[in-house]
């Protein structure tokens, strides 16, 4: 298990994405991935609509802009297949497995442990989710 990173939590707010942040997420995706791999608005919006609780963002407290995000879908399937990336209807809120679909950190926010902290926060949230179900 990771340790709580106080410095990162002072610099960034970790929370679930809001619907009004879809455009920001799509822009970050376009920066972090080549065009043939980047998730488009057409596929990102349904992910956020279907599983906002599985879309964690890190927001820079000074600029109030998204710096990074991690997202996934829940399922009872055991293997990640290509259709998860293009069909958010694969999400099953009662699913016992989480398929991680993207981890994006803007270049200017890299190399300070932000991706690791997103993964740790995501893991904690999903452990709580499991306990509630």
Label for each model-derived stretch:
Residues 16, 27-40:
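Helix-loop element at the rim of GNAT/NAT acetyltransferase active sites that forms part
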Residues 65, 69-103, 110, 120:
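Conserved acyl-donor/pantetheine-binding loop and adjacent beta-alpha core of acyl/acetyltransferases
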Residues 113:
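Conserved G/P- and acidic residue-centered "switch" motifs that form tight phosphate/ATP-binding loops
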Residues 98, 119, 126-133:
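Conserved GNAT acetyl-CoA-binding A-motif
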Residues 1-7:
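Short acidic N-proximal helix/loop "leader" segments that mark the beginning
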Residues 34-62, 71-80, 84-90:
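Active-site rim helix/loop that mediates acceptor-substrate recognition in acyltransferases
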Residues 17, 103-105:
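Hydrophobic adenine-recognition pocket in adenosine-nucleotide-binding enzymes
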Residues 11-25:
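A short beta-loop-alpha structural element at the N-terminal edge
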């Amino acid at each position: 298990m990771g340790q709580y990173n106080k410095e990162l939590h002072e610099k960034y707010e970790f929370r679930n994405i809001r619907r009004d942040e879809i455009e920001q997420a799509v822009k970050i995706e376009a920066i972090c991935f080549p065009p043939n791999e980047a998730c488009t608005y057409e596929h990102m919006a349904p992910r956020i609509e279907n599983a906002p609780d599985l879309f964690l963002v890190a927001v820079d407290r000074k600029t109030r802009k998204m710096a990074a995000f991690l997202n996934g879908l829940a399922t009872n399937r055991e293997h990640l297949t290509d259709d998860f990336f293009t069909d958010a209807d694969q999400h099953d809120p009662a699913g016992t497995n989480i398929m991680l679909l993207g981890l994006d950190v803007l270049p200017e926010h890299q190399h300070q442990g932000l991706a690791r902290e997103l993964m740790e926060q995501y893991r904690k949230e999903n452990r709580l989710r499991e306990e509630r179900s």
